Amino acid sequence: MTDKFNYEELGLKVGLEIHRQLDTKKLFSPVPSELSDEVDFTFERRLRPTMSELGEIDPAALEEFKKGRKYIYEGNYRLTDLVYMDEEPPRGPDREALEVALQIGYLLNAKPVDEVHFMRKIVIDGSNVSGFQRTAIVAVNGKVDTPWGSVGIPTVCLEEDACRIVERKEKEVIYRIDRLGIPLVEISTTPDIHHPEQAKVVAKYIGDALRATRKVKRGLGTIRQDLNVSIRGGARVEIKGVQELDMIPLIIEREVERQLNLLRIRDELKRRGVKPEDIKEEFYDVTEIFQNTGSKIIARAIKSGGKVLAVKLPKFRGLIGKEIQPGRRLGTEMADRAKKYVRGIFHIDELPNYGITELEVNAVIEKLGLGEEDAFVLVAAEEETAKNALREVIKRAREAIEGVPEETRRALPDGNTQYMRPLPGKARMYPETDIPSIFLPPEEKERIRANLPELPQERVERYVKEYKIDRSLAETLVNDERDELFEELVEKGVKPSLAASILVVVLKGLKKEVPVENITDGHIMEAFQLYLEGKIAKEAFEEIFKELALHPEKTAKQVAEEKGLTLLSEEEVEKIIDEVIQQNIEVIKAKGMGAMGMIMGRAMAKLRGRADGKLVSSLVRKKIQEIAG
């Protein structure tokens, strides 16, 4: 595939940050690391930023505090305790989680530290009850080799996950604290990635190392991949929440495109001679112009006592509407910033539209005294809210004159990104005083290093040799993290080829029809147990899994009985075959064994999932031979 850009020429730099939940107990309390929708109690908090040990306040924390939100926490007695309500000092850390993190460090060619020191990272969006996240470096100076060159892994960290969000309101956020404290491994790379595909290769290698431990959680939300992307002349932008490995190259490509277009806008603004100080914080009340407007949004705001305010953006005409990513413009970036106060903005490059007439646009131009190259942005809301929203627009416009702002952005499903918050500063770390430092004896580190698990690629090779299964099946088993379940099934006596086929082919085929993520390992084990006990045929798996995906509260046995998928006795099978034979006796007399395919098809239509195919074939063959002589 041809590259859209010359990344070397553009000076592309990418760094990865990968977080993965560990499947152990919680990090600082011996409670299960599970999620539940059962709520036993609630409590509330308000959080405030504090200075770091250098006497500085983190800008991202300060911006979150300014929103003035109250945080409500839902808890479950089984899955939390006073540690995670911030009413009791932490215990631990969990030794198993620490050992898994050290294994991962070794697999990434990193050197374990001699002492583990936990730090506090300020987080006041409410996702941590205490207002900080505990994190510790466990290994340093790792590396991943790629065809483009080596990429450094400066740190492997062990930290605690945050609460999960239930509902976000304007002045209130509801969190569930069951996820809080689940151990996370955080792996950071150096910005030595210079091609989008290289980023994917590195992410896959790290993912393989994580999966090798067989101690990482699976499923939605258990892995989070963040990217740090910049080009020469642009800025470092952190992109959060990249869910799929295959999306990494596209997201990087789109961010390069965005930064290039923002630099072009900057150059055009410079050519037009505009400076940041030319954009004044002056609000024009243009409500009168829109008293009889056809715009429902504006009319609704005026009716509820709001105002229509405008700001002047000198020399910005034609640039606010300029596309910077497919379907997104500079105006979209301004709207994203304003969204903490209002639902949307109107700007000159998209008008007349949305019920706003050319007459109204011209009236605003006249009132603001705009020149041919000047632009305006409108907001309709309560006066102070409108002013706050327009202040965000002004701030973003000033940044556009400078080029690309440093910020944290959210990955969108289409590969684009959206503004989240300013880039966090370094002024948000300070020592954790409740957890003593942990000395790692050399003999303990050597024991862990000597007993490292096999990497996924090594496992694939072993499956091909040991179990004689197709390489593509082996690769899918490992990549889809079904390998541990596969080995358990084989150990129980299931033929490797059958176990692999059901786990890969059948489940993959059902993905288009039903939510297969609802099918648990427990469901699968139970279905195979029924098969091993001779209670279902292998043809029944598809039907059972389909029903379990739609109704995960059921058991495999329940589904088999409800759907009539339990195996018939040989006598019952023979009786049904006799009926099929009698219905087609003339064809058999005429064709003899040539009727085998037709009779087999009709018999299996009645017996599929209720009788073993080999038994049916044997009985059909025997009976046709008897008739044909």
Swiss-Prot record:
**Which InterPro entries does the annotation name?**
Asn/Gln-tRNA_amidoTrfase_suB/E, Asn/Gln-tRNA_Trfase_suB/E_cat, Asn/Gln_amidotransferase, Asn/Gln_tRNA_amidoTrase-B-like, GAD-like_sf, GAD_dom, GatB_C_1, GatB_Yqey_C_2
Q: For this UniProt record, give its keywords in alphabetical order, as a comma-separated list.
A: ATP-binding, Ligase, Nucleotide-binding, Protein biosynthesis
For this record, the Gene Ontology CC terms, alphabetical, are: cytoplasm
Enzyme Commission numbers on file: 6.3.5.-
Record keywords: Nucleus included?
Answer: no
Keyword Hydrolase belongs to the record: no
Tell me what reaction this enzyme catalyses: L-glutamyl-tRNA(Gln) + L-glutamine + ATP + H2O = L-glutaminyl-tRNA(Gln) + L-glutamate + ADP + phosphate + H(+)
The molecular function terms in GO held by this entry are:
aminoacyl-tRNA ligase activity; ATP binding; glutaminyl-tRNA synthase (glutamine-hydrolyzing) activity
Listed under GO biological process in this entry are: glutaminyl-tRNAGln biosynthesis via transamidation; translation
Task: Detail the disulphide connectivity of this chain as listed in its UniProt entry.
Answer: none
Q: Where do transmembrane segments lie in this chain?
A: none
Question: Which leading EC class covers this enzyme?
Answer: ligase
Subunit composition?
Heterodimer of GatD and GatE.
Q: What does this protein do?
A: Allows the formation of correctly charged Gln-tRNA(Gln) through the transamidation of misacylated Glu-tRNA(Gln) in organisms which lack glutaminyl-tRNA synthetase. The reaction takes place in the presence of glutamine and ATP through an activated gamma-phospho-Glu-tRNA(Gln). The GatDE system is specific for glutamate and does not act on aspartate.
Per the record, the similarity remark reads: Belongs to the GatB/GatE family. GatE subfamily.
Task: Please state what the protein is called.
Answer: Glutamyl-tRNA(Gln) amidotransferase subunit E
* Naturally occurring in which organism (per UniProt): Thermococcus kodakarensis (strain ATCC BAA-918 / JCM 12380 / KOD1) (Pyrococcus kodakaraensis (strain KOD1))
